């Protein structure tokens, strides 16, 4: 596995699904996706749960808001790859985003 993508989430109902879909639309598919939910009270936790059957998808459910840094650190602790990428729950990635990011990370320049 080349990369772990971590999405911390709290009440991202309006964006989370599209954000996750943009990750799964990447041309580079050698990644795992970890969503860390920080006690969402909207429907975004249910949106995240709908991906649990996908390979290389992990959902960490915090019952309350443990804070952004703690959520990110939880994701990092579960990462199985050399490279870890933080991705906001309201961000949308172009299809080449991960491939280009990994190319830059792996280059000698």
Residue ranges and their predicted role:
Residues 2-4, 32:
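Cell-envelope/extracellular polymer assembly enzymes that use nucleotide-activated donors
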Residues 17, 42-51:
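Acidic helix N-cap motif at the loop->helix transition within catalytic regions
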Residues 22, 37-46, 64:
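A conserved acidic beta->alpha catalytic loop
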Residues 22-30:
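Short, acidic, metal-binding catalytic loop of nucleotide-sugar glycosyltransferases
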Residues 31-39, 58-62:
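Short beta-strand/loop segment that forms part of the nucleotide-sugar
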Residues 61-79, 89:
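Glycine-rich, basic loop-to-helix element that forms the pyrophosphate-binding segment
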Residues 84:
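Short aromatic/hydrophobic "clamp" motif used to bind/position activated sugar donors
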Residues 95-109:
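Conserved donor NDP-sugar-binding/catalytic core segment of glycosyltransferases
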């Amino acid at each position: 596995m080349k990369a772990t993508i971590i999405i911390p989430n709290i009440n991202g109902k309006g964006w989370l699904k599209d954000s996750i879909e943009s990750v799964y639309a990447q041309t580079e598919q050698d990644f795992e996706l970890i969503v860390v939910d920080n006690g969402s009270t909207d429907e975004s936790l249910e949106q995240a749960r709908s991906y649990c059957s996908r390979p290389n998808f992990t959902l960490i459910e915090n019952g309350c808001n443990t804070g952004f840094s703690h959520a990110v650190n939880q994701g990092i602790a579960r990462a199985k790859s050399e490279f870890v990428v933080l991705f906001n729950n309201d961000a949308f990635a172009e299809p080449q985003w991960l491939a280009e990011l990994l190319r830059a990370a792996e280059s000698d320049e």
